[in-house]
Amino acid sequence: MKSYSRTRCVLVCAAFIGLFSIFSFRLIYLQAIKHDEYAGLAAEKHVYKQIIHAERGTILDANNEVLAHNIPVETVVADATHLNSQKAIVDLVSAELKLPPAQIAEKLSSERRYIVIKREVPEAQAGVLREKLRAANLRGIYFEHDATRVYPNGSMLCHVIGFTDFDHRGIQGVEASMEEYLHGQDGFRFIEHNRAGQEIVPYRGQERPPRDGYQVHLTVDLSLQNIVENEIDAAMEEYSPQKATIILMRPQTGEILAMANRPDFDLNFRGEAKPEEMKNRAIIDMMEPGSTFKIVAAAAALNERKLRPDSTIFCENGLWNFGGAALHDHRAFSYLSVRDILVKSSNIGAAKLALSVGEQRFYEYIRRFGFGERTGIELPGEISGLIRPPQAWSKISITRIPMGHEVGVTPLQMTVAMAVIANGGKLVTPRIIKSINTPEGKTISSLSPVELRQVISPETASEIGDALRGVVSDRGTAAAAAVPGFTIAGKTGTAQKVDPRGGYEQGKYVVSFAGYLPAEHPEFVGLVVLDDAHTGKPELNYGGLIAGPIFSRVAEKAARYLDLEPHEEIRKAIPVERVEKTTPAERIRKTGPAERVALTNASRH
């Protein structure tokens, strides 16, 4: 009996020891071996990684006028694992955020821990929802501080500024090209919630503060942009063109002072914009420039010293057969000087100028002026245009290209080419970015002018400039581009519109004018392009009669704004109305020699 009791006691003790060992091993397994894993699982139920969004940098004009900034909003998100009453939450959230209940219910039916319910909720509206959730003891809905992008000027400068997507990433314009600087770096913090879903602040964990985006200052002057926008709107109203572009640029530095295109769109309602309205036609549209391109042939002939400005060329009395095809002038000219070939815009004269230097050398000058390559402006989507090498030319190409046919150029390329003449023969990269600053205002990058090459000699540039002054006179094709009190140098362009299916569209033209002011000391180069302007009379559809007057109005108002000094005698005779500036700007005064101001109608070309 005693032996039996002793055996039973041993067995019981062994059982207890075995159970104790099992529980001890299990405890050690959970507390030591699996501690990190289960601690992480437990933390996931109550710890939440909150993203602290960096504020996107502001975009400003040259005078610190705001072009794009942020307004604080909140993003409403849900953690499906924390929801304590899905139906009540759906009813409340749908009512407050004006969302369909079915849409919210579908989102919350998943087991995901991060579900975006609605973005860009105004702070006041988010505050009301937050209080109602707390009062009803509903858990699983959280709020993230965010910002929405606002463009205070609506459609003004829309193609340059661009816009962002829902994730605040730039996808067009400066918003895209300067994304690296504007976006900043998001931060985060780990926060712990109690059973009610409220943050336990003392238990706030690791945190990394955000770095806000940098400020980007443009070279554009909003006051000059306003002048250009008003004039391009007036042109759209008067001529109903399919497309239009106006550019102002400082020739010495390449700074873009204004750039406008039509059609356009409101940056704040970009969801309503059509694809055609969102294109920056200044850099992505390819056109045959017409007679504005004649400056290249004239510059090549003079720079190669094949001819002098007063050398005369026989212009065949308006009709010349070359390579089995006829080339016409808009009027019958006999002998014209090189200067007058530009003044009168002779197609035959321009063709003979190109022939004097030869195909290969002429092609090299075309490329030296920057055609056939991107200008390098800090905007996305720029095209290089189309310039074929001489091997791909036909027998008559050498006579058609000098008059701006058989080539494809962008409006910005044509502006830059005219700036070569205004800048003593130097090709400068166009710029839209002035500087990049920290949010505190410290400059981290100030971009300097980039001179690419000396295209032609200063003497040749001066000779071409003298001829272009004659274009804007009662002898030339652009008398209507004149500005009282100032000398203008410029060139008209009229090109039949290219049909995408081949050939040309009958009765449709691209009219343009490129010029600079004052001719002696240029402060800006301007380009006006209208695609398929409607005049009602085909005989009026010329660059000098349509684009020239638009340039005149833009240039006159820009000269007033910049406080450019007109010639003294004319200034007394014609009072100049002053334009008020919205912000202080550097005032540059230039005085040039007297020259007759043409007020007569231009020749048709």
State what each model feature region is:
Residues 1-270, 281, 286, 358-372, ...:
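Periplasmic/cell-envelope proteins involved in peptidoglycan metabolism and beta-lactam response
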Residues 68, 194-207, 246-291, 296-533, ...:
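Beta-lactam-recognizing serine transpeptidase/beta-lactamase-like catalytic domain environment
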